[in-house]
Amino acid sequence: MKMKRNHIIHLSFRTKRRRFFAMCWTTILTFLFLLPSCITEDVPDNTPMGNFEALWQIIDNKYCFFEYKNKEYGLDWDEVYRRYKNKISSEMTDKELFQVLANMLNELRDGHVNLIANHETSQYRTWYDDYPANFIDTIQRIYLQKDYVSTAGIKYQIWEDNIAYVYYESFSSGLGEANLDQVLNELSICDGLILDVRNNGGGMLTLAERLAARFTNKKILTGYISYKTGKGRHGFSSPEPIYLEPATDRVRWQKPVAVLTNRRSFSSTNDFVSKMRQLPKVVIIGDKTGGGSGLPFSSELPNGWSV
């Protein structure tokens, strides 16, 4: 009786094991059958036409400023597609394809939109090349000479009439809170401050906000932002307010400030100037900045180039 019971248990175990493996195979086969149906988008071929289509679609789905560019200078992205598609040939070389795609991107007139390949990187330079530089570093060297102080990318000096001069050349430098405390403490004896951000091509938005926060004692509305929420040219969130908050428990400057700008004040420098413009003791002097606000993204084409 005991052996019979063991035999029954053994048969039951083998039966369950067979059922278990049968279920596993059924699940795997079902998954493999359904997997191709999960791919809903066509992947462009790695051909000149495939890379052209991929690039145009990336911009069409993700670029934010179509409406503004259409009002500003009549950009029609669909017309750009038709015009540049006629320039694509299956026999063209990589360099020829690169030039056509780079020219298409330049239709956006955006300094942040670049095509990057192994042999070259495209850049739209007209946004500053067509404007006067209004910045001569020789004059700056004459004024600063050799007795200026430099820390974390900032050069500063006290000039005649008790005016402080500060030149900040890049928001990519490691500008810390302690650096700003040091600079503003040393310049606190001055009656006014010239903050020069000409030729500052941008960098980190966090540093732009960190610097601007030293010039206000209260929270202030500086603008609005919308986020891209999906594909298409009109997929944006509702505008959300942007506030500048003072740097609490830090040295803050509450005397007059003149911010010097030129066309090469770009990207996060543009955001910095936009914030400073809202402050009551700040005046902006110089050219219209180069723009370039927002957070750039990158995507890859079938041939490995990126945009």
What are these regions (language model features)?
Residues 38-228, 235-242, 256, 298:
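Flexible, low-complexity junctional segments that flank or bridge functional domains
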Residues 32, 187-189, 251:
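Alpha-helix termination/capping residues and helix-transition junctions
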Residues 1-45:
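Bacterial Sec-dependent N-terminal signal peptides
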Residues 206-307:
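Conserved acidic, small-residue-rich alpha-beta core segments centered on
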